[in-house]
Amino acid sequence: MLNGYGENCRGKNHGNFKTILLIILTKKEEDMTIQIELISASELADESFNIVINDLKPRETYRVEMYLTDYYCINAPMLLAHDVLWKSVATFVSNENGIINISQTPSCSGSYEGISTMGLFFNAKPLTNMRKKLPNSLSKIPLLDHFFMEIKIMQGNTVIAEKTFTRHYMSSQISHQDIYGKHFQGRLFYDKKAIKTPALIIVSGSEGRVEKAQNIAQLLSSRGYICLAVAYFGLEGLPKHLERIPLECLVEAKDYLRQHPQVDSERIGIYGRSKGAELVLAEESLFNDVQCLVLNSPSDVVYEGIKGKWNSHTSSWTHLQKELPYQKFRLGDYLFSKFFRKTFPKDCSARIDIGQIHSPILLLGSAVDEIWDASSAIDDIVSHYKGHYITFKKYHETGHMLTVAYQPNHRYRKDWRLLMKESKDSWLATIHFFDRHLKKQ
């Protein structure tokens, strides 16, 4: 029996695996003990994992269902309730030894087909579009640092085995603290035992809030950094809209980290994505005093601010209470660029002075970014950079949402395998770049 990938749906032997994390469920089915094994390098949500089901009947069809609860997905709409149930399903045929090995046994039907270790997880979808109002205050924003994954093994309508286990965005040794500055609010993630540790500031996009930034900060803090997830508007005590945001929000965040007793003040980096990357570039063109920058889906010009759903007729950013020159939003230019797939001219006065930045830079972006032309921005940043080290990666499937490895991304109607590959590649590039420039060899 062949599937669309030319693989035998009766599967293969699961081979020899080093089980680093093993979860075993036992349940009697006609005097057989069914075992479910989860194999992963760690419990962190940005690590791949394999599922092996042993002691099934040989050459039988089984349905594997995955349910995610309390799952925060960085790629999902901001208003999607985090307690919405996510689900994926795949049908497998056990091999002659009664084994289903997700990394080797092809899925014959369901949420995906063929062989993919993370196919079941990446193809999970929310069962409803239930939305929740976002909290107005930092203290009321949940940590969202873990989620539960339930695996059910089905034959027909009968559950013959099931197990729930936990995946984490944040390692158990990491603590957190809410920080309230004059121009920013943030959530600090740190190991209480850390000494002279490199630190990162994480700034997310045009939502301005802390949820997406903290998701990234939790994972990076679990990899040996003190991380400050920064909110720069949209919360009580901060500007209401993305307009006239003081660059001093980043200056203040950097000063906070430099004074932190556990931080090595000579090893600080910044991660900015989307509008946050624009903010980082604008600020660093005036105060280039960190050791490295990762800019995800960047812009090399200052764009007009946003007030609700409309353009604000002001700059996005200020310095010393003075607006930075900005590129005005013109609907005609925008429609022209989308219809003809050509870039519209950039206002020279709104260009960020990249030549003033000497920190090492990693640029990540898409050649098919649906929000703005990140690809040409990367080209312009590289051409105007006068420092000693700059590198970039461009992707051709994923658009503006290049985020955390393996997290479901249903924004794009593309080959999900390529979307997953690009999310993994861009995330690993981020980790390796920070490690290279901030961790002592």
Predicted feature locations:
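Hydrolase active-site cap/lid region
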Residues: 281-338
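Alpha/beta-hydrolase active-site loop
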Residues: 241-261, 282
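N-terminal cap/lid segment of alpha/beta-hydrolase-fold proteins
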Residues: 38-44, 49, 143, 148-195
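C-terminal catalytic histidine-bearing segment of alpha/beta-hydrolase fold enzymes
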Residues: 387-441
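Alpha/beta-hydrolase fold nucleophile elbow
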Residues: 263-274
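Short beta-strand/loop motif that positions the catalytic acidic residue
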Residues: 357, 363-365
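Short alpha-helix in the alpha/beta-hydrolase fold that links the catalytic acid
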Residues: 373-384
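Short substrate-entry loop that stabilizes the transition state in hydrolases
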Residues: 195-197, 202-239, 370-374
